[in-house]
């Protein structure tokens, strides 16, 4: 983990503030941010600060080292897969650590949009289902968005790209500089399988 943290600290020297950050674990490290940003005409800078094995127990410290320096406008948090055993043994401590992370982010940047992303649960695992219930509750309690990616969704990225392109071509979105809804970002980044 230390090697990845140092790598992100170096990359932060090149990064710009007010972007979108994916802050997750191993399965998020390979999200193709550049291609998805271009394909869906996302104007904000996007950065992936995901770390293999990232635990909610270490999340605040890792956030401070890897994410806070670039003062993101939006953070998409996808943490919990590495915490399944911790959750099983200490569910209330898991909740407290997650809420601590969200409160910490808000204390550093009150205007930061935060989305808590569920764990994928394509096999209907009861433990993951329970973790996702906790994540939903935590997101609601902390007044954050909740992105549910637990089940496979029927989604056609090509038709979404065509719709976005058409809307931009006729001038409805780009001139207004509207922020993309967080759920759209979640769908684009976490439900698009290459």
What are these regions (language model features)?
Residues 1-52, 57, 62-71:
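Serine-esterase "nucleophile elbow" of acetyl-processing enzymes
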Residues 38-42, 61-194:
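Alpha-helical cap/lid subdomain in secreted, periplasmic
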């Amino acid at each position: 983990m230390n090697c990845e943290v140092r790598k992100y600290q170096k990359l932060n020297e090149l990064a710009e503030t007010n972007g979108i950050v994916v802050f997750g674990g191993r399965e998020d490290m390979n999200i193709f941010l550049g291609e998805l940003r271009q394909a869906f005409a996302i104007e904000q800078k996007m950065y992936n600060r995901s770390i293999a094995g990232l635990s909610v127990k270490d999340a605040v410290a890792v956030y401070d080292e890897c994410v806070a320096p670039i003062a993101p406008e939006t953070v998409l948090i996808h943490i919990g897969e590495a915490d399944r055993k911790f959750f099983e043994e200490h569910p209330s401590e898991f909740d407290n650590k997650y809420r601590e992370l969200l409160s910490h982010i808000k204390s550093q940047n009150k205007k930061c949009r935060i989305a808590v992303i569920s764990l994928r649960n394509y096999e209907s695992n009861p433990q993951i289902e329970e973790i996702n219930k906790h994540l939903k509750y935590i997101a609601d309690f902390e007044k954050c968005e909740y992105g549910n990616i637990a089940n496979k969704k029927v989604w056609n990225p090509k038709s979404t790209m065509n719709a976005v392109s058409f809307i931009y071509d006729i001038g409805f979105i780009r001139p207004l500089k509207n922020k993309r809804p967080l759920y759209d970002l979640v769908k684009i980044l976490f439900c698009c399988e290459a």
